[in-house]
């Protein structure tokens, strides 16, 4: 019911001015008690039928906000989760860690003292779109050394880096690794 100073909404449209006001309201809420980290997530519904989906998106965005800014206030719109890295932030930390350990774990469990070099090679190789020469250049190594390291990664993980699906699994596992807190 609309009254003086009240805004009304029709199905599929937010009340006039609600969306543009949200950043300003969020800034006020965050500033009211800066020592308390506030987290919020938003999702968009284009119709009444889309409300359940919008709620699910908002919950996922909220989980992402909590993950990416555990000690600071953050408001994330589900529409901003447009890449694999940002999409993965909405997955619970325990699930991300378990996935990473499952996929990359053999590198660590093998007792391989060169696991750090293998992980670095894997990260650079994937960042260079599987280019042997660009990876070698970025790591200041000979191409044969890159080939050897990639073969070792494939051996320990059971993944084939010439397969797109295996590359995606390994990239996701790297992104899911637990992050160490920054040193002061």
Give names to the regions the model predicted:
Residues 1-184:
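Cytosolic nucleotide-utilizing catalytic cores of signal-transduction proteins
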